[in-house]
Amino acid sequence: MPRRRLPGLTILAALPFLAGCDLTAQQMPPSHPYFVFFAPDSAALDGAARTIVTDAAAYAKVYPLAPVTVTGYGDPAVGAADAARMARLRADALVKELTADGVDAKRIAVRPPAVGADVASSQAARRGDIVVGLLP
């Protein structure tokens, strides 16, 4: 009675095809930050900001298992409540643009508004951060 070798032969026949598979799209990427700057007292994305968000979305699509984290910043000089509100609006604008560019909203985590002494300058306080990959 002949032995059944079909499963083993099937696996051997598939090896040349599997050897050419590119698994990099499934691996976790190095953390990649993107910094988006806004006009004072604004959460509107200008052309340069949209380009940065589009670049972040493209990178996120290459690594579909990587988390995407968004943080909005606000200028503490305008008061804590107003700065927190602006930071949330900026984060929301980034999330909206990322999803419009094809990033699944379920992958995007929004960090609490960043307001306070850790924001060293008014320019730094007028930004939003997008990090694709694990946070450092």
Model-based region annotation:
Residues 33-38, 72-76:
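A short small-residue
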Residues 1-21:
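Sec-dependent bacterial lipoprotein signal peptides
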Residues 23-27, 56-57, 119:
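Short beta-strand/turn micro-motifs at beta-sheet edges
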Residues 42-71:
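Periplasmic peptidoglycan-binding/anchoring modules of Gram-negative envelope and division proteins
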